[in-house]
Amino acid sequence: MSDKQSFTREEYLADVRGANGTRAQWFALMLEEAEKAGIDLDKFCEDTIYEFGLGRCKKYGVCEGNPGKMAEMLYGSNGQDVFEMELAEKTDERGVLKFHFCPLAHTWKAMGLPAERVAELCRLACYSDFARADCAGVNLHFENQIGRGDEICELVFTPRKDGDPSGAEACRVDCAQKDGE
């Protein structure tokens, strides 16, 4: 007799989204305590979340600095269904992914956190995404983010040019540009 279990697609998605939600909860609580201790959250997340992203991106070199390849690779990942991804554009000059669901933002909102805190947690969690873009040799900009109150997350990948900021720098700049609108 086999101990192997089978799950429906819906059960699998619920479990994976639940795991992402648990991660979102401890991330929020951890940063709350770090803030109480006087730790600079950007520096802390750059040193941890950005490093986490770098550790996960070994396969991203196959993108060869091509934004469309980066978008396509992420679209083909296990996260496609979890984040309800849409591959909106795939060219050598631009790759665009749209996420129609974010289990992290969903959890932070369900925790009753204020909109400003959800937006800040979202931005800090994105250090990982910017690290992955660095590994792929492309730039990343978030045109929209569910955590900022937008309907979707829209990740826009463009070619990296000499003098472009690192992903960590881009994470801070991306937020400042959105806040300045």
Where are these regions (language model features)?
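N-terminal accessory segment detector
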Residues: 1-123, 128, 139-153, 158-181
